[in-house]
Amino acid sequence: DALNEYMIPKYHIEVEFLPLQYAEYQQTIQLMISGGDELDVMPIYYSNASSWIAMNGIVDMNQYMDTPEGQAIKDVLGEANATVGSMNGILFGFPAQKESVELGGLTMRADICDELGIAEEYGLELNQDEYTGKVYDWSVATEIFKKVKEAHPEMTPLYLQGSASPMRRLAFFDELADQFGVLDWEADHDSTTVVNEFETDTYKEAVTQLAEWFDAGYIYPDALTDTQGSAVMMKAGNTFSYMSAIKPGYLVEAKASTGTDCYAMYFGQDVEGGYSTTNVSFYDTGIATNSADPEMAFKFISALYTDPEVMNLWQNGIQDVNYKVLDDGTAYYVDGEDASNFKYHQNTGWFMGNQFNTYVWNDGSKDANYWDKLQHHNDWAQYSPAYGFMWDSSEYSTQITALQNALNTYRPALETGSVGVAGVEETLQKLNDALYAAG
């Protein structure tokens, strides 16, 4: 009601939300599109874009980009990011303002790092997780794992599991939406040649490194089949570290999930990190063709990116009723409410609109400058030469399913190191033979 009290006089728009659980989002939206149900503004996960466009379910917003509202979106996102949610010339959505570059590394137990002198050697500190340009080669991790293994043979230096690929932490490929045909960023930042990721030297070197760690006893021996997860294993004291994407405020989240203080170290071959289309255009905000008034829907989308009052009302509710602004400029629950009993609070700005226009929520990991820190984090990255390209795979769904099945057969063993160094060549050959056989 408060949002409409603001929207109606200013924009002549009345808003009605349709709350959905994440698990039901894709099916519900798809049924609404195909069934002709009235639907205006919607989040679009990048992998759904091709099929929903093929269903004629998404409005091409190019027609609105020369309007004042379209220009306002470009002013916020920049020209490149404002048009990144495009396929076959159709502008289907705008990306959320969020951290979009994946700078990866290790999350490590602070007590073990302190005990073994690792923290002192590398200048590690609690809650020091902002990227400053300092990045380490993975050979440094080998030395750290060796120290931990010698001092604590009962503990696994590195936890991996077969269901969660670590490849994005080890090497950056522009996966061009589905990774069956990629740009090998590590080999050549400027190349636009599409290659088979699993035949590249970059991929082979990465899985060989994992196999060496596995043979040395540095990786959890049941990594291929284990389902417990890194947080559970660290909380139980069974592992020293795990691979993760790191960003400002990350270590507070890590402590909450693992129950222990952690340090973070950035690792990788590529110092800057890379921007691919799907890094930025992971979730987009678009308009359904079922919309009763696409032009007004576009004006609402523009408000999500340009009007702080709209985003704060949607995300935080009414000031001094649902949240209060603290002396440091951050927002928090009103007196008498907390995470267990709040009446209204969203945490969805990361997938729709411009969360940088909202108050930073004081969860213990962030200060009022947090959005500036995320933008600075993004600014380290370089754009892939294929940035803005998203392959339309809708005509190849059968082949992609067969390729995915082939990949799932061999990838977990390779990417947990479980094949050992002796098995890398043979398993890679089997994987590529299966991929070519699948089309």
Regions found by a protein language model. Give the residues of each.
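Extracytoplasmic/secretory soluble proteins
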Residues: 1-439
